[in-house]
Regions:
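Lipid deacylating catalytic domains
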Residues: 1-245
Length: 245
């Protein structure tokens, strides 16, 4: 029963979980949350603990390289949301709404098992432990854990286009992720989903095609160049012949 009680932020077990989470973050612990987009057991928003924000939390998405297409608009959009969260910015709740909209298996439903068997899942946690600053020395351990209240079965699918529009027109997001937004708009135009669930999602994401983006860099300093990275989603999804994180 406790497993289902986690679906409400005001349940006894959820409150106790957040209190324990705050204690380990204050002690300087780094946390890694990796979720599978093809998991028929654990929703992505739950696996990624998307309701919480803290600089010591790193998130990543596992994508089975065999089950999924080489390039999938939905996967890349989810990866962009994870990247935005990892950079410490607000994703306008798009990650949670997207994962709630596609809860359950999208292709094979094997992601829940394969996630635990993928060596790079553990490699990422090890790299995050040893290759980033200590939360104690950087001051991250003194930052409070910020949480968003939630309740079971309260997802409103009509919030999705508003959330998407808010993200794409956020001046901070447009400044740092303009290259990625341009890619997303092009990929959406070429997206041809086949299942009813994904076709419904495509219709709700229709505002993507109406967003206007500048063709020239903005006047803000230090805007990332299109030549900065070969893969704009590398921090959120590491490419691998077998799988992607």
């Amino acid at each position: 029963r406790e497993l289902f009680d986690f679906q409400a932020s005001d349940s006894v077990v959820s409150i106790a979980h957040r209190a324990a989470y705050r204690r380990i973050l204050a002690a300087g612990v780094k946390c890694v949350h990796i979720g599978s987009v093809d998991d028929n057991v654990v929703p992505l928003y739950s696996a990624l603990f998307s309701c919480a924000a803290h600089p010591s939390i790193l998130r990543a998405v596992y994508v089975d390289g065999i089950a999924f297409p080489q390039k999938d608009f939905l996967i890349m959009l989810i990866a962009l949301c994870v990247l935005i969260r990892n950079c410490g910015f607000h994703d306008h709740n798009l990650l949670t709404l997207l994962s709630a909209s596609v809860a359950g298996p999208l292709y094979t439903g094997q992601g829940h098992t394969n996630l635990y068997l993928e060596p790079r899942v553990y490699d990422m946690a090890t790299q995050y432990l040893f290759e980033t600053y200590s939360p104690k020395s950087s001051g991250a351990s003194e930052v409070p854990l910020v949480g968003m209240p939630y309740a079971p079965q309260r997802w409103n699918s009509y919030e999705l286009p508003w959330s998407l529009r808010g993200l794409l027109e956020d001046s901070v997001i447009r400044h740092f992720f303009m290259k990625d937004i341009r890619i997303m708009i092009k990929d959406y135009a070429a997206w041809t989903p086949t299942s009813k669930k994904l076709k419904d999602l495509q219709r709700r994401l229709a505002p993507m095609s109406t967003v206007r983006v500048p063709t020239e860099p903005s006047d803000m300093k230090d805007e990332p160049s299109d030549a900065d990275e070969d893969d704009p989603f590398l921090p959120a999804m590491v490419l691998h012949p077998r799988a992607k994180l």
